[in-house]
Amino acid sequence: KSSLFFAKILLFGEYGIIEDSKGLSIPYNFFKGALKIPETPSEKSKNSNSILFDFCNHLKQIKGLADLDLILFEKHLNEGLYFDSSIPKGYGVGSSGALVAAVYDKYSNNKITVLENLTREKLLKLKTIFSKMESFFHGKSSGLDPLNSYLSIPILIKSKNDINVTGIPSQKSNGSGAVFLLDSGQTGSTAPMVSIFMEKMKSDGFRKMISSQFIKHTNSCVDSFLSGDIKSLFANTKKLSKIVFENFKPMIPDEFHQLWKKGIDSGSYFLKLCGSGGGGYILGFAPDIEKAKNDLKDYNLEVVYHF
């Protein structure tokens, strides 16, 4: 039986980790996927199977990398193998990451497993393998999404070459504060959004804002979340939400600009990008989730973590 691989949420670090900020990524068990061979092929399984065939050809180009048994992979593909997944594509919750993790898990001959002592070297090795594998899906990948899905534990990124598995404060089921996902109702695409960011990074003003403000507040958010300092977390999330609103407009779907600003002005909720933006989910932080739910009653809200 194939293992299940979960979605992920990058709580903090979108765009920042490209420029060496801290980041914090957590598994999200609400969505999941597994490799399967269908009894009778469907439209869905055929589409997935054809993507996996292309993916297999990509893996042949980098085959020295992960010691993958591509002959077995191809045999299964000819039997109709597909990735049966509930993870929405283009939503910033790691649909391609889970697929990459599943393929590595099933076909790597000498895989690094969750059960062994995960040294920093092993984590970086996995991340490198995953980054090359996932580049098939969106050009440039940090390897973090598959890593998160594969290990299914929170990951703290301290810098590009310093990643650790981490514990996060346990949830308070009766807490009034919460992290939630807001459904934008449209899909986003990673590659064009990252290109816009890279283009903007060529301007001195934007670069300066990233290093002096964006990264600073991202790092403070990670620190205050992990230490359980909720007051500081909301203060920094508010600053981050404002910086994103002022400098990352193309990544925020047009019809959410007003809503984004309303949250900052009222203090009821603070929105931020979930992954690369441009659609998919928008991440929200609310000091009082009931009030936020009321203010956002026309939207689909999914609470993912209670403070």
Protein language model annotation of sequence segments:
Residues A98-N110:
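Stable alpha-helical structural segments in soluble proteins, enriched in small hydrophobic residues
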Residues S2-F12, G16-I18, S25-P27, G33-N78, ...:
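C-terminal nucleotide
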Residues S86-A98:
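Gly/Ser-rich catalytic serine loop of serine hydrolases
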Residues G94-S96, C274-G279:
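Glycine-rich beta-strand-to-loop/alpha-helix junction loops that act as flexible
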